[in-house]
């Protein structure tokens, strides 16, 4: 994989020169960060997150280089990646056989090929970013630097095929068949199915619904369906203000988990923005979040300040506090009901 990354980097200067006359475009993103967790984890790994995952350590949250192909009837994206969020996200990637597992999968953020079947219908296949939720893996594209709990505990990526239908410029619908809940390698003989519908009601208001259904148990365990549904509303009352609310609910084997987030972003002036988030997440039976202690029933709030220092350079700082009904957050060698994070990031896009 290292040889593959070096090969891509070697062609970047040439590719950049022809980008303006070619359907192939090269771009990239580097997100550096420093995070302070008041729990001061002894192994430096922060709990219950993949973003800014290391305490008191300068590191790379996500760095990727991408090749994008855009033609009238063919499209594709190849993105190679590294960073602590990558290490965290692929830690649970199953290893089944000799050519699977996190060490093989984690450096591919996306490797997807798309072909237009009709004027309004596309077929895409490969490793792709998830169709779930309202937040991106790439922090630059989110109103807050850190992701909400509902985004952290829903799939970041998936491997499969999808059909995307855009009957009008205001409605987009897709159906997808994937290997499972955030896994490239298979865990059983079944596939999961998902769907999403996005509808732009007006220039200021858009809504979306998404779902995923499948058996996530290994072959040697009894089959049990996981059902997941979510919805999001994005309201942009002005060029300077955006409000996004998202809610998810899932169930498996008689247990239910749910969560929600309300995010607001205000552009104070060009180059300066403020963002705030309230969130809630309840996984009483620890279906997705194993605490090793009490149930994960947590609420939280965050406040962020974003500065654009130069074209393509963004400095983001966020403070986030989480509070649980039970003591679940590591606090040195004990557990606490609260967790406080201060993180600052310097990112480059090109």
Show which residues each predicted segment covers.
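Cleavable N-terminal export/targeting peptides
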Residues: 1-22
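Outer-membrane beta-barrel channels and translocator barrels
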Residues: 21, 70-74, 118-120, 130, ...
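Short N-terminal segments immediately surrounding and downstream of signal-peptide cleavage
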Residues: 21-36
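Outer-envelope exported proteins of Gram-negative bacteria
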Residues: 25-29, 77-83, 124-126, 176, ...
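Residues on the lipid-exposed face of transmembrane beta-strands in outer-membrane beta-barrel proteins
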Residues: 28, 56, 60-69, 110-115, ...
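Surface-exposed coil loops of outer-membrane beta-barrel proteins
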Residues: 33-58, 86-110, 117-202, 208-215, ...
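Outer-membrane beta-barrel pore domains
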Residues: 49-52, 86-89, 96-104, 136, ...
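Glycine- and aromatic-enriched membrane insertion/assembly motifs of diderm outer-membrane
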Residues: 52-85
